[in-house]
A protein has these predicted regions:
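Small-aliphatic-rich amphipathic alpha-helix that forms the alpha element of a beta-alpha
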Residues: 22-27, 102-155
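A glycine-rich helix N-cap at a beta->alpha junction
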Residues: 62-73, 154-181
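Conserved, non-catalytic sequence blocks in retroelement Pol enzymes and Pol-derived host proteins
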Residues: 16
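Glycine/small-residue-rich phosphate/adenosyl-binding loop
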Residues: 37-119
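Short alpha-helical scaffolding segments that buttress acidic/His motifs in well-ordered protein cores
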Residues: 1, 23-27, 168
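C-terminal helix-cap and adjacent tail motif
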Residues: 6, 163-208
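Generic N-terminal amphipathic, Lys/Arg-enriched alpha-helix
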Residues: 1-13
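Glycine-rich phosphate/pyrophosphate-binding beta-alpha loops
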Residues: 28-36
Length: 208
C-alpha cells in the first residue's frame, strides 16, 4: 500500500486480459452493503470507447485547470510541482490510448448516492491494490464527473437508475513505482473528540 501511488505516465504496452481479469476479480472481493453486490465494472478498451474517454478527459482538464490554477509548465521548470503537472497533462493528452474501467452502482430509493458509493469505493481500492501487486500502474480519475459523466453514461448505455461513482485508468507504468508522499498519519487521527490528538496511540505505534 505504501508504494501504490497514483501513476499518470504509462508505456505503450497494452494490458493483457489475464492481468486485467485478476484486477477485476479482486474488485469483487471488496465488501458491499448487505452483500448486495449491485455493482458493474465496465472495461473501456475499444477505439470508439477510448475516444469518448478522451473527450471526457478533455472536459475534466478544463475544470481542473481552473480549480487548481494549473497550467502547462515551461520546459525549463524542474520543480516538483512542474513534474507533477507534466504527468497530469500527459495523462489527459493520452487519455484515448489507455484501457480503463468505469464503476457503476445501482441506486436504491432509500439511500443517498454518497451512501451507495460506499458500496463500490472498496471495490475500486481493491482494483488499485491488485494492479499494484501485479506491477501495473493505475489512476483514479475525475473523468466520469463534470460533463464527462453524461458522455460516458450515454456511450456505455448506463441506465438512469445507476450512479457512476468512479473511473480508473490502468496500464504499465513508464518508470517505476515508488513510495507515496503523505503527511504523518498522526496529524489525521483524533481520539474521542475532534480537537483531541491521539498521542497515546501514536506513541504505541511500531516503527519499522
Amino acid at each position: 500500500m505504501s508504494t501504490a501511488r497514483t501513476i499518470r505516465r504509462f508505456s505503450t504496452q497494452p494490458v493483457d486480459d489475464v492481468t486485467l481479469a485478476r484486477c477485476l476479480e479482486a474488485a469483487t472481493w471488496a465488501p458491499s452493503g448487505a452483500n448486495a453486490q449491485e455493482w458493474r465494472f465496465v472495461v473501456l478498451k475499444s477505439p470508439e470507447q477510448r475516444a469518448v474517454v478522451a473527450e471526457a478527459a478533455a472536459q475534466a482538464l478544463k475544470v481542473i485547470e481552473v480549480a487548481y490554477g494549473m497550467t502547462r509548465p515551461a520546459a525549463d521548470d524542474l520543480s516538483r510541482r512542474a513534474r507533477d503537472n507534466r504527468a497530469t497533462y500527459e495523462l489527459h493528452d493520452r487519455a484515448g490510448e489507455f484501457t480503463s474501467v468505469l464503476f457503476a452502482q445501482k441506486r436504491l430509493r432509500m439511500a443517498s448516492d454518497m451512501l451507495l458509493a460506499g458500496s463500490i469505493f472498496p471495490a475500486m481500492q481493491n482494483l488499485l491494490l491488485a494492479a499494484r501487486a501485479q506491477g501495473l500502474g493505475a489512476c483514479l480519475t475525475s473523468w466520469a464527473s463534470y460533463g464527462g459523466e453524461q458522455l460516458l453514461r450515454t456511450a456505455v448505455g448506463v441506465p438512469d437508475d445507476w450512479i457512476i461513482p468512479g473511473h480508473i485508468v490502468v496500464g504499465w507504468p513508464k518508470g517505476r513505482h515508488g513510495p507515496v508522499r503523505r503527511r504523518p498519519w498522526q496529524d489525521a487521527v483524533n481520539l474521542d473528540r475532534w480537537d483531541e490528538r491521539a498521542d497515546d496511540i501514536a506513541s504505541a505505534a511500531v516503527v519499522d
